[in-house]
């Protein structure tokens, strides 16, 4: 066995031993205390001596925003750091009762306008929208290597969608469904010169087109890598690749994106997917791909240019790594990229400066590897500080491993040096982690969050379904110190810590905002001004009800419609007081929506039940809140 092969592979015995241990540990629910060995457990009963405190006193503000994914809940959660207090939830792929997301016309437009034709047809008898989502990997937009406060992007693994959230109003304004690929797992955004592209991994392999004509012919299955234009929210291009794509990241020069891959065997069962000792990362040459699109070197599939990036393509390179790598994370020095081994106890470090020579065929794929330290069992994701250190989650060991990149490179060259600085027990089984400003050139090395998949005994027992456990770790000193445990409902997959100076939300909607422009246009067509209108307009069996709201009264205290009319209610909050949100709910009609200061919200429904139906303000906005109500009178159909 050559030295290169020795460094890049696990032996069959090592691989099966690791896999068996993973399975046994998972089955028995072993926690970090049993697996940690001689590692340090550094729990803080408050702030460590000389360390930082998570306390934010009443009336004071957190230093950072944390944008948490929620997995199968389908929303984004905003948390303050270091307090770890939940501040707000942004509904995206889910149906939200409080705000009316998924019910209001404005939200339904966002949820439906980006659907693929076949799914639009599929959903016709299912309420026209997907009722579930699996939101992963929320990442803010960049300009010149740091967050610019414009947008947040995330992916939906359940229904192959990508969303964009406006950070000025903290609302989702665009959702698109990706053609040709099957699910999205792994999303990152272009860091330089700006976002730019949103890179999306197609995890599962399916036939293209996926129309049932090749159900069991796995040779027709393909995985797709997608670049979405983050400004237009249209697919810019796609690349067909070998294997299943997992996670993705990109460089700080705007030249390359790279994805981890499992199932290089292209199997359909667990045993088949694990049969090889190696998988790979795929490196995408952005300039060459853009030239391919410009020169027509692609096949158009479902209206999108699809480039062949399988083995042998000039647009991609495949670098072998140990079996089933998971996370891939670019270091803040702009040079190094770390692929995390998952089934291997190692992480693989690449030097992006070598990728030019790799694509020019001047070096072999493994020549781009500059380190491959062994850290522990189940490395999944890596974060960074401002001192050249990396922090890798070890799922099976229930630990965070702090290690030094330069020392790992020295060890790879044969020096007798240990790159590991510390191992910290976390509670329990960490997946993603993230450091403060840790994906930007402005990383500050203060805080790390470990998103742990199990909480076990950390909280009061709440029944069989238990919360996740997000642990806040002080990394400002030489030693990592846990300073806070925070429970999360199902189920965070990644989080991003952004300094508050980068985000500048408004407190009032602008009346010129495009979010409710359709309502403004309809009112104008009816000869009305939404800021003043309190009228009912009938157009055949379609009725449009316009009303203002100013606490504690709606502009209309009653309106009359006929049974089976299609009713659209437009409510405009004309209050100019910060934090004075109104609601509009109709009793026993399944209607409720949020109406923020200076915003218009609308809802359309069929008045199928005759009778008297009270509507009321569902958000507490005034001492006379209970009296802020009115009547919808539905006249029965004439015999």
Curated annotation (Swiss-Prot):
Main location: periplasm
Stored SUPFAM superfamilies: Cupredoxins (SSF49503), Nitrous oxide reductase, N-terminal domain (SSF50974)
Residues annotated to bind Cu cation Z3: 137, 432
Annotated Ca(2+) 1 binding sites: 453, 468
Signal peptide feature range: 1-44
Cited Gene3D superfamilies: Cupredoxins - blue copper proteins, YVTN repeat-like/Quinoprotein amine dehydrogenase
Region (COX2-like): 541-639
GO BP terms, alphabetized: denitrification pathway
Record-listed E.C. numbers: 1.7.2.4
Pathway given in the UniProt record: Nitrogen metabolism; nitrate reduction (denitrification); dinitrogen from nitrate: step 4/4
Positions of Cu cation Z4 binding: 493
Annotated compartments: Periplasm
Binding site for Cu cation A2: 617, 619, 621, 625
Residues noted as binding Cu cation Z1 in the record, renumbered to the chain: 326, 381
Binding locations of Ca(2+) 2: 262, 265, 273, 279, 324
Cofactor info, note text: Binds 2 calcium ions per subunit. Binds 6 Cu cations per subunit. Each subunit contains 2 copper centers; Cu(A) (binuclear) and Cu(Z) (tetranuclear). Cu(Z) is thought to be the site of nitrous oxide reduction.
Entry binding sites for Cu cation A1: 582, 617, 621, 628
Binding site for Cu cation Z2: 136, 185
Listed GO MF terms: calcium ion binding; copper ion binding; cytochrome-c oxidase activity; nitrous-oxide reductase activity
Post-translational events: Predicted to be exported by the Tat system. The position of the signal peptide cleavage has not been experimentally proven.
Any single GO CC term annotated in Swiss-Prot or TrEMBL for this entry: membrane
Protein family (similarity comment): Belongs to the NosZ family. In the C-terminal section; belongs to the cytochrome c oxidase subunit 2 family.
Function: Nitrous-oxide reductase is part of a bacterial respiratory system which is activated under anaerobic conditions in the presence of nitrate or nitrous oxide.
UniProt-recorded name of the protein: Nitrous-oxide reductase
Organism: Brucella melitensis biotype 1 (strain ATCC 23456 / CCUG 17765 / NCTC 10094 / 16M)
Gene: nosZ
């Amino acid at each position: 066995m050559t030295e290169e092969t020795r460094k890049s592979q696990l032996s069959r015995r090592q691989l099966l031993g690791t896999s068996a241990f993973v399975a046994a540990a998972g089955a028995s629910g072993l926690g970090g205390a049993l697996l940690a060995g001689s590692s340090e457990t550094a729990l803080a009963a408050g702030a460590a001596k000389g360390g930082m405190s998570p306390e934010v006193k009443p009336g004071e503000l957190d230093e950072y925003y944390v944008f948490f994914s929620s997995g199968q809940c389908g929303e984004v959660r905003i948390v303050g750091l270091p307090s770890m207090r939940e501040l707000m939830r942004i509904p995206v792929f889910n149906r939200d009762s409080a705000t009316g997301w998924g019910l209001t016309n404005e939200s339904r437009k966002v949820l439906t306008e980006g659907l693929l034709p076949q799914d639009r047809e599929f959903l016709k008898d299912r309420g026209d929208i997907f009722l579930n989502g699996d939101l992963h990997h929320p990442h803010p937009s960049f300009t010149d290597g740091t967050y610019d406060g414009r947008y947040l992007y995330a992916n939906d693994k359940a229904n192959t969608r990508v969303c964009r959230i406006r950070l000025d109003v903290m609302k989702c304004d665009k959702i698109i469904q990706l053609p040709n690929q099957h699910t999205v797992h792994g999303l990152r955004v272009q860091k330089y010169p700006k976002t730019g592209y949103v890179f999306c991994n197609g995890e599962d392999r399916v036939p293209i087109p996926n129309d049932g004509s090749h159900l069991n012919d796995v040779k027709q299955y393909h995985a797709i890598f997608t670049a979405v234009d983050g400004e237009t929210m249209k697919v810019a291009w796609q690349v067909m690749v070998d294997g299943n794509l997992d996670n993705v990241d990109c460089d700080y020069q705007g030249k390359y994106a790279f994805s981890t891959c499992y199932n290089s065997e292209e199997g359909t069962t667990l045993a088949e997917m694990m049969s090889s000792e190696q998988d790979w990362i795929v490196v995408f040459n952005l300039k060459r791909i853009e030239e391919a699109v410009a020169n027509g070197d692609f096949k158009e599939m479902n209206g999108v240019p699809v480039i062949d990036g399988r083995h042998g393509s000039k647009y991609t390179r495949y670098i072998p790594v140990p079996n089933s790598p998971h996370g891939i994370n670019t270091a803040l020095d702009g040079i190094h990229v770390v692929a995390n081994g998952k089934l291997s106890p190692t992480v693989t470090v690449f030097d992006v400066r070598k990728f030019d020579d790799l694509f020019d065929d001047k070096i072999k794929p493994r020549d781009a590897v500059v380190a491959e330290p062994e850290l522990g069992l189940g490395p999944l994701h890596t974060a960074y500080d401002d001192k050249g250190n990396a922090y890798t989650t070890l799922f099976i060991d229930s630990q965070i491993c702090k290690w030094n990149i330069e020392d790992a490179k020295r060890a790879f060259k044969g020096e007798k040096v240990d790159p590991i600085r510390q191992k910290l027990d976390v509670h329990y089984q960490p997946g993603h982690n993230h450091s403060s400003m840790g994906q930007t050139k402005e990383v500050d090395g203060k805080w790390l969050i470990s998103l742990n998949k199990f909480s076990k005994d950390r909280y009061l027992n709440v029944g069989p379904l238990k919360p996740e456990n997000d642990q806040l770790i002080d990394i400002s000193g030489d030693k990592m110190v846990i300073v806070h445990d925070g429970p999360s409902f199902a189920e965070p997959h990644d989080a991003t810590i952004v300094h508050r100076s980068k985000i500048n939300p408004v407190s009032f909607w602008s009346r010129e905002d495009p979010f409710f422009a359709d309502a403004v246009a309809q009112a104008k067509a009816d000869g009305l001004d939404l800021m003043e209108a309190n009228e009912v307009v009938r157009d055949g069996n379609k009725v449009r009800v316009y009303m203002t709201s100013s606490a504690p009264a709606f502009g209309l205290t009653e309106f009359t419609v006929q049974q089976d009319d299609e009713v659209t209610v437009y409510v405009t909050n004309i209050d100019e007081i910060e934090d004075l949100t109104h609601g509009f709910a109709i009793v026993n009609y399944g209607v409720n929506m949020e109406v923020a200061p200076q915003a218009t919200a609308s809802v359309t429904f069929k008045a199928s039940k005759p009778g008297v139906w009270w509507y009321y303000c569902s958000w507490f906005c005034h001492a006379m809140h209970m009296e802020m109500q009115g009547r919808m009178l539905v006249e029965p159909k004439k015999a």
